[in-house]
Design a protein with these regions (language model features):
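Bacterial N-terminal signal peptides
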Residues: 19-31
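Solvent-exposed loop/turn segments at secondary-structure junctions
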Residues: 72-76, 98-102, 124-128, 140-141, ...
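Signature of lipid phosphatidyltransferase scaffolds
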Residues: 136, 140-186
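Primarily the HKD phosphodiesterase
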Residues: 57-117
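Bacterial N-terminal signal peptides that target proteins for export
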Residues: 6-22
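Short, flexible loop segments at the rims of nucleotide/cofactor-binding pockets, characterized by
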Residues: 42-47, 68-71, 118-120
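Boundary at the C-terminal end of the N-terminal hydrophobic targeting segment
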Residues: 35-41
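Structural recognition of the beta-strand scaffold that forms the well-ordered cores
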Residues: 67-70, 93-96, 120, 134-135, ...
Length: 186
């Protein structure tokens, strides 16, 4: 090998090395690009990840209100947990898609006969109410791909995230209230 060739190659890499070094030092000086507190999140998966049991526990811990916006509800276990919460004095509101009401199964009948407020979207603008979230006591949001159905728990690959960030909760509550005002009572 030619010693001058090696030297030139080393010299040509030096500015690149310095740039990388400065970049690393800059990142150490400013550890986060997103100031503010970190958001706490619990993440669950199905099948076999226990999403339903985590939702039931969150329902049981609620004391004031639960607002649920889901495309479909067929889980009688979740419906029963909501009715039990209602019997404890927790205000329950369910927002679902019109199509879900037309094929209402036992879960929706349990909720309806127990006096839970249920409204549907999809009539006015022919859009699906395809949200999947719930707000618990203005303190926790549950959101993800998980419909409140038997198949979501046992057969589908689904996810659910529980978030307790007040700004995130407020935004979801605001969206629920907006949709609730547009929805038709059942």
């Amino acid at each position: 090998m030619n010693p001058q060739h090696d030297r030139r190659q080393y010299v040509s890499m030096t500015p690149c090395t310095y740039s990388v070094l400065l970049l690393c030092l800059g990142l150490l000086a400013f550890p986060t690009a997103f100031p503010g507190p970190a958001i706490s999140a619990d993440v669950y998966f199905s099948p076999d990840g226990g999403i339903r049991q985590h939702l039931v526990r969150t329902i049981q811990q609620s004391r004031q209100h639960i607002d649920v916006a889901v495309y479909q509800i067929t889980s009688t276990e979740l419906a029963s947990a909501l009715v039990t919460a209602k019997d404890r004095g927790v205000r329950i509101r369910i927002l679902t898609d019109q199509e879900n009401l037309q094929s209402s199964g036992p879960a929706l009948r349990i909720l309806r006969t127990s006096g839970v407020a249920i409204r549907s979207l999809g009539i006015v603008e022919q859009r699906l109410m395809h949200n999947k979230f719930a707000v618990f006591d203005d303190r926790v949001v549950a959101t993800g791909s998980y419909n409140w159905t038997q198949s979501a728990e046992r057969a589908n690959y689904e996810n659910l995230v529980l978030l307790d960030d007040s700004e995130v909760v407020t935004r979801f509550q605001r969206e629920f209230n907006r949709l609730w005002r547009q929805a038709e009572p059942w």
